[in-house]
């Protein structure tokens, strides 16, 4: 065992794994109301709840370096590493070595072990919450206390410290996620919307600030005070544009200018509103009314107390401002996802049909090739049968020619096959000449 492993015994009173006698343990004998019940070993052991580990187990505390090692158990013969002791024992059987080397060094009974986390602030650092599996404590330490993300997804750039988590993520990544314009993929709609808000906020923050509107459109007005803002000679100009360049004290301005300046200040900060001052519907001809007022009351030209300002103030949001609605965006996202899912299903179905057609085509081509081979083989067999038939006919003809008796030869010729080809005839003639020569030699001797 390595030096960085510290074996702690539960018999020590300093550890918190010791269960007091007053605590209720389902595996201890209890006496209530005069009835004594004892759970024997023949009964089925129930699973212990969290916080009550096996009192006979040994508490093992491994260092972070040991927990981050990928292969803990190493074969002495081939130096191959394994994560579990059982895998090492199975591997040792492949080496044809004596049984003594396969046995353990000591015949001491192996006790059950529980593993604690080396991080002091972790819940599993307490022996009461120790983990009973070495692989489990390794995965826990890599997930919670390790910053080394060894496996990174190529689609969403999400890193994982445990390979099993990375493989599980690859099965679902991109199938049911929400992709942003920046390239990130989210599996939850809430996280995706929050990221979209942050991205849009960053874009708005990066845009150059718009200059505040410095002009207010004032249509034809019935009062003389609204038309004499800049100079007294502009009495006949009832409609125009008032340029607001520098702020002026509000006390020396008329009431409609105070309202317009305050609204301009608020609009530049909030919603960029457009301000319009419209006359009342009763004032159909403001020029004629102002001329009559000049003739009848010339002394009231500089007296603003007798003048009345009848204005209609309409405030509307700017057309360039677009209100951001999360609900509409969610509906659009969900609709686009549904369309994308349907398109993906149709694409998968088309690909499957294409693969099936390709497979059927390959099967047909193979059957056609087999049929051609069978046809060629049949033709070869037919040619061979014809050749054998011709050979047999030639042998029969040669046998008939060897018969010396004319009577028997006539009988055989009566039932013989019709005349053969020119080659067969020449062959028969040669056989006849050879037969006659043999007969003459026999008669001569």
From Swiss-Prot:
The molecular function GO annotations come to: DNA binding; DNA-binding transcription factor activity; zinc ion binding
Chain segments carrying region SHR-binding: 188-200
Whether Protein transport counts among this entry's keywords is: no
Summed up, the tissue specificity of this protein is: Mainly expressed in the endodermis, the gravity-sensing tissue in inflorescence stems. Mostly present in stems and flowers, and, to a lower extent, in seedlings, hypocotyls, roots and the shoot apical meristem (SAM).
Q: Where is the composition biased (Polar residues)?
A: 32-42, 214-248
Give UniProt keywords alphabetically: Coiled coil, DNA-binding, Metal-binding, Nucleus, Repeat, Transcription, Transcription regulation, Zinc, Zinc-finger
Q: Where are the zinc fingers (C2H2-type)?
A: 73-95, 115-145, 151-178
Q: Which PROSITE patterns match?
A: ZINC_FINGER_C2H2_1 (PS00028), ZINC_FINGER_C2H2_2 (PS50157)
Q: What is its main location?
A: nucleus
Q: Where are the zinc fingers (CCHC-type)?
A: 178-201
Q: Which residues bind Zn(2+) 2?
A: 180, 182, 195, 199
Coiled coil located at which positions? 340-397
- A GO BP term, please? positive regulation of auxin biosynthetic process
Q: Cite the record's Low complexity compositional bias ranges.
A: 22-31, 281-293
Q: What induces it?
A: Not regulated by auxin.
PANTHER family linked: PROTEIN INDETERMINATE-DOMAIN 14, SERINE/THREONINE-PROTEIN KINASE RIO
The molecule here is called Zinc finger protein SHOOT GRAVITROPISM 5
């Amino acid at each position: 065992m390595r030096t960085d492993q510290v074996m702690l015994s539960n018999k020590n009173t300093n550890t918190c794994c010791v269960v007091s006698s007053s605590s209720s343990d389902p595996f201890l004998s209890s006496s209530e109301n005069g009835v004594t019940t004892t759970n024997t070993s023949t009964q089925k052991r129930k699973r212990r709840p969290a916080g009550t580990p096996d009192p006979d187990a040994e508490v093992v505390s491994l260092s972070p370096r040991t927990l981050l090692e990928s292969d803990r158990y190493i074969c002495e013969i081939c130096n191959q590493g394994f994560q579990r002791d059982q895998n090492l024992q199975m591997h040792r059987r492949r080496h044809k070595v004596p049984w003594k080397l396969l046995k353990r060094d000591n015949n001491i009974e192996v006790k059950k072990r529980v593993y604690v986390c080396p991080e002091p602030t972790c819940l599993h650092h307490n022996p009461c919450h120790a983990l009973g599996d070495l692989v489990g404590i390794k995965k826990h330490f890599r997930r919670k206390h390790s910053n080394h993300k060894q496996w990174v997804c190529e689609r969403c750039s999400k890193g994982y410290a445990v390979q099993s988590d990375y493989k599980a993520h690859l099965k679902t990544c991109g199938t049911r996620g929400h992709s942003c314009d920046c390239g990130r993929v989210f599996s939850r709609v809430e996280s995706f919307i929050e990221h979209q808000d942050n991205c849009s906020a960053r874009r708005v923050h990066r845009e150059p600030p718009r200059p505040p509107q410095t002009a207010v459109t004032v249509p034809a007005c019935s009062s003389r005070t609204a038309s004499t803002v800049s100079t007294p000679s502009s009495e006949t100009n009832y409609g125009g544009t008032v340029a607001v360049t520098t702020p002026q004290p509000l006390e020396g301005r008329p009431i409609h200018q105070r309202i317009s300046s305050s609204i301009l200040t608020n609009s530049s900060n909030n919603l960029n509103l457009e301000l319009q001052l419209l006359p009342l519907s009763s004032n159909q001809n403001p020029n004629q009314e102002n001329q009559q007022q000049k003739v009848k009351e010339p002394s009231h030209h500089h007296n603003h107390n007798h003048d009345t300002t009848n204005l209609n103030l309409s405030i509307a949001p700017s057309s360039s401002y677009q209100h951001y609605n999360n609900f509409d965006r969610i509906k659009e996202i969900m609709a686009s996802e549904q369309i994308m899912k349907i398109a993906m299903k149709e694409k998968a179905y088309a690909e499957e049909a294409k693969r099936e057609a390709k497979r059927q085509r390959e099967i047909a081509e193979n059957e056609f090739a087999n049929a051609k081979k069978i046809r060629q083989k049949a033709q070869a067999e037919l040619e061979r049968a014809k050749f054998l038939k011709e050979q047999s006919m030639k042998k029969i003809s040669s046998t008939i020619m060897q018969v010396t008796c004319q009577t028997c030869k006539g009988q055989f010729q009566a039932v013989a096959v019709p005349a053969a080809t020119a080659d067969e005839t020449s062959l028969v003639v040669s056989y006849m000449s050879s037969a006659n020569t043999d007969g003459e030699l026999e008669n001569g001797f």
